[in-house]
Amino acid sequence: MINICIIATIVIYLVGMLLVGFVYSKSNEDSSDFYLGGRTMGPLVTAMSAEASDMSSWLLMGMPGLAYLTGIASPGWTAIGLAVGTWLNWLIVARRLRRYSANLDAITVPQFLSLRFHDQRNLLNALGAVIIIVFFIPYTASGFAACGKLFNSLFGVDYMAAMILSAVVIVGYTIMGGFRAVSTTDLIQSVVMSMALIAVLVYGVNVAGGWDVVLDNARSLPGYLTMAASHNAADNTATSYSLLDIASTLAWGLGYFGMPHILLRFMAIEDEMKLVLSRRIASVWVVIAMTASIVIGMVGLGMTKAGALEFLSGSSSETLIVRVASLIAQHGVLAAILAGLILAGILAATMSTADSQMLAAASSVSQNILQEFGHMKLTEKQSLFAARLTIICISVVGVVLARDPNSSVFGIVSFAWAGFGGSFGAVVLCSLFWKRCNLQGALAGMLSGGLMVFVWKYIISPLGGVFGIYELLPAFLMSLVVCVVVSLVTPAPSAEIEAEFDAAK
């Protein structure tokens, strides 16, 4: 009976997402509607869809698990970097990008860069699209894998079957409703994620014996409640959290300036003046959600201390919220429905990221590669068909990549984050705020940043020591330096480009 209630809750949730896609399926008249919702999104939807698509399953799985095992330092510094990055992205980039992209009639990030620099050969379009595809496909695969593992661990459902079902639902509402459906479902999913965090937190504190007991337990563990050390659960010791560690975790915030699926939200809002409200909503939600996520890890350890939960070692710590949901479900039908809602929250965290990534990748293939770089003349219907076909193809490849339930596909998430931040971040900032930046500089910056991610990750980082820093930071700096230097040693932009730059101020 308990499993039936949980499954019914999740099924109702998934069917609801498909209905949203169906409702918006008739509102996509052209590619601008499909990719950007016709630039008609309100401030609440813009804010919450951006943050829901940002906060993938790591918010409900990775971050609580990390806090559970190591204390508050690593997740805490990461959260600070992400919170500051979120706020700066909304404050600095959002309004300028909305105005500039609307002036140029750009509907994708690569297209914006191409039009910004009058790239007649569409090299920026092609390079940007390739980068998006290279990093988004495995990123999407990790989302499918999360869904498959969730159903498999809870109900014993075949991993592959569960993953395919999840992919079908995500692909279904995305290809039907496009950006409007994705943004609306992301808003709904952010609410579900919030409810899941609150329910787990309240229940966990109660089972652990109260907040004072949770804090006393955390204080008794070496290095657990300090931002200057990390707790080692294996031998109950503390390890110093170095400046290098802090720099690596804070560097996550730089990734926001280059995230295509987040930048698209800025481009889609109906009125740039409403971005102020969106920024406030997004920033507050991010801080509260990440704080709750870290505290859940601490509370989970308190539950283990109280004997309500077995000790979760290694990667099993990421199933903390799933384990708590299972405990909640034991308290009757209503509790089982609540547990189903919590598990739907994990699905929501995964789906809200995967749908946005697939839409961004589809726009890159249909708009940037086929039409602009490949010079294919497509009607609006043909363009939308190409985008929808691309989404299906990406999902198939993603399912194939994640077909092994023991695969390490989750490891690609931080690498993909670095890939986007290193490739696009500095170039987007230069294109928006530096008039002297030119096509050659943007191309060189994007290419060097993307390559540095691979070089640092696989060649330099294994050397250890100071070289063990997160690859996003050196890639971002390399891209910035190369973009500036190449722009300065090559011809200045034309008067027309400079006039367009001034018009977007």
Located regions from the model:
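Membrane-embedded helix-loop-helix hairpins and adjacent transmembrane boundary segments
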Residues: 1-505
